[in-house]
């Protein structure tokens, strides 16, 4: 086992009857969160709340770099420590906000943070972000940010049989012609052999099934 926190599985209290549940942080504790948790015990509570406010503002799309630098100077925080705290808070909140409130309950969230030895009062501050009045705005901003890249708007395909081609080996061999249109208006056309098309169909169906099974399994464990 590596000495780095990222390689350590997410642990639970020895007496926890739900020791097999999955953390909202994943099966492996993110290194940013592990580093942050080690620093919170000696961190001034006022400084923590100011950092948390900056992280929330960052998640809402605001640029807080100058304010963070000023806080680091006034609180006498080394740059490395400041970066570790911000990265850990950002990762923790981002992971929690990925799950709908119906999947991640407040009590479960608090219990799992306490298992990381995060002080009780700081757990309450973090929970107020994930389950408080700012949640709708954070969800809205996350959806907008996720829509920056173009997505598939239309996908069509048809089977084509070439009866005349310069490649004699391909004569009378069926293929699949595909047309992909994206939300930004761009379109792509390409040709795929039927064997590869069948592999693609199988792979996509398998991935979708595994994703659905994993989602159901995680939801059940988080609700335990």
Curated annotation (Swiss-Prot):
Sites bearing N-acetylserine, chain numbering: 2
Keyword annotations from UniProtKB, A to Z: Acetylation, Cytoplasm, Nucleus, Transcription, Transcription regulation, Ubl conjugation pathway
Domain spans labelled COMM: 151-215
Pfam families the record matches: COMM_domain (PF07258), COMM_HN (PF21672)
GO cellular component: cytosol; nucleoplasm; nucleus
The keyword Nucleus is annotated on this UniProt entry: yes
Role, per record: Scaffold protein in the commander complex that is essential for endosomal recycling of transmembrane cargos; the commander complex is composed of the CCC subcomplex and the retriever subcomplex. May modulate activity of cullin-RING E3 ubiquitin ligase (CRL) complexes. Negatively regulates cell proliferation. Negatively regulates cell cycle G2/M phase transition probably by transactivating p21/CDKN1A through the p53/TP53-independent signaling pathway. Involved in kidney proximal tubule morphogenesis. Down-regulates activation of NF-kappa-B.
Protein name, as recorded: COMM domain-containing protein 5
Annotated source species: Homo sapiens
UniProt lineage: Eukaryota, Metazoa, Chordata, Craniata, Vertebrata
């Amino acid at each position: 086992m590596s000495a780095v926190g990222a390689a350590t599985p997410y642990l639970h209290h020895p007496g926890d009857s739900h020791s097999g549940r999955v953390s909202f942080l994943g099966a492996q504790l993110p290194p940013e969160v592990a580093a942050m948790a080690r620093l919170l015990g000696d961190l001034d509570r006022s400084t923590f709340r100011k950092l948390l406010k900056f992280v929330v503002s960052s998640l809402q799309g605001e640029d807080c770099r100058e304010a963070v630098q000023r806080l680091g100077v006034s609180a006498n925080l080394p740059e490395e420590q400041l970066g570790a705290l911000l990265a850990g808070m950002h990762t923790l909140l981002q992971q929690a906000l990925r799950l709908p409130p119906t999947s991640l309950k407040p009590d479960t969230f608090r219990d799992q943070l306490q298992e990381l030895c995060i002080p009780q009062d700081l757990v309450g501050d973090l929970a107020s972000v994930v389950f408080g009045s700012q949640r709708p705005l954070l969800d809205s901003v996350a959806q907008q940010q996720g829509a920056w890249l173009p997505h598939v708007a239309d996908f069509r395909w048809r089977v084509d049989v070439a009866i005349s081609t310069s490649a004699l080996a391909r004569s009378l061999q069926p293929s699949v012609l595909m047309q992909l249109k994206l939300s930004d208006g761009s379109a792509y056309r390409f040709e795929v052999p039927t064997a590869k098309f069948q592999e693609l169909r199988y792979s996509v169906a398998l991935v979708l099934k595994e994703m659905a099974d994993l989602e159901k399994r995680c939801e059940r464990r988080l609700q335990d």
